[in-house]
Amino acid sequence: MVFSTIIFLLRFLPITLALYYLAPPKLKNTVLFLCSLVFYCWGEVRFFPVMLALILINYLCGLGLERFEQNKTARLILLLIALAGSLGMLFYFKYANFVLSSINAIFGTGFAPIQGISVLPLGISFYTFQTLSYTIDVYRRDVETEHNIIDFGAYVVMFPQLIAGPIVKYRDVSDRLHVYKSRYKLKQIEDGMTLFTFGLAKKVLLADAIGALWTDIIGVADSPSVSFVGLANASTPLVWLGVIAYSLQLYFDFSGYSLMGIGMGRMLGFDFPQNFNYPYISGSITEFWRRWHMTLSGWFREYVYIPLGGNRKGLKRQIFNLFVVELLTGIWHGANWNFICWGLYYFVLLALEKLFLLPYLKKGRVWPHIYTLFLVVVGWAMFVGNDAGVEFGLLFRKLFIPSGGVMPLYFLRNYGVLLAVSVVCCTPLIEKLWKLLSRNAITKALTILVLLTVSMAYVVGSTNSPFLYFNF
């Protein structure tokens, strides 16, 4: 079930909120758990056992870690069981066929692909990391063991963040999970509705609209009747315009989903962590990764980078740790060599900044932002090079070897205003405008009402538009 659909907006969400608010305090987590299962199983019921297995593995290992509090060996074995079980399922469903096909390509073997796993269980990359963060934190004694399986299940499958984040650690919500009375206040619900509306507007008014520019250039894989330019016919300037449009679409799509999730979490009484902080205003790649998908970066930093030694064991070890994290980041995004190359691409950039570039970037004012945006857009070109209808080699030849073809003037006329608005919405200027409007209760309410009404009109009139990060 997608947030930006009629069935979610006008049926599931209001019914779920009504049941949740009307439920007795002690039953709120049960209602949340059951409604979240309905949300997940709506389109992915065949993968429900996978999620249930992950919940049970980490729940039981958590209990075992408490049971063997003084037995270091037993605790380590239980942690390894949780890691092997959780990561093993993620590997099987997401990476097994990729590994087999890669072995076939490299060694000329004839391993047949595993049948039945061509479709990835929805959200598995996200909820696997959430369950693992709980077990690791219990092992490290950073959080107490959760004894109530319904409460633990509600944490794992909580529908606002289940499918595409933000990645919520157990300690982020554990206190609120055990507050049964006065979990939320009217102000929280109001703030949550505001955040949800902004997220919905980001998705349907900006992401989907600007994504149409990229579609006009590259085409739609499942709609051959739709007219488009085609990558082979596009000029170099038009291809750059298309990749910039894709970069904007990806940001508004993912940050919009995250904002909707954070808003719904607030309506339920939970404070989810921020996931984006205007990444396109960054003045370095290092800063970009502090602002983009912050919960994923934070997860890798806490559970991989720091345990490997972090910044404590000299520059060479820092570079190695960075290599591991960026490689895993690329692998996490998808079972494809494009994503692995994308992760290694960012490793090289981050390593160069750590070695010598960062001091120079901090001294600059304009050029560091141009440098960062250029490299980020090139990175997204590697990202989209995996999509249907995009030939990776042709895309990069078009980007870096000047070629003729259809020019961008027509598209600039059609999308110029939208591009300008999108660029402004990538900066803190939009937040300053909102603070100005929200000083007055009437203008605040009218702004939200207009955004919600227009967004709903677009939802009603549009076809299905899934979130891009559902693929990961």
Language-model features: where?
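Membrane-embedded transmembrane alpha-helical bundles that form the catalytic cores
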Residues: 1-471
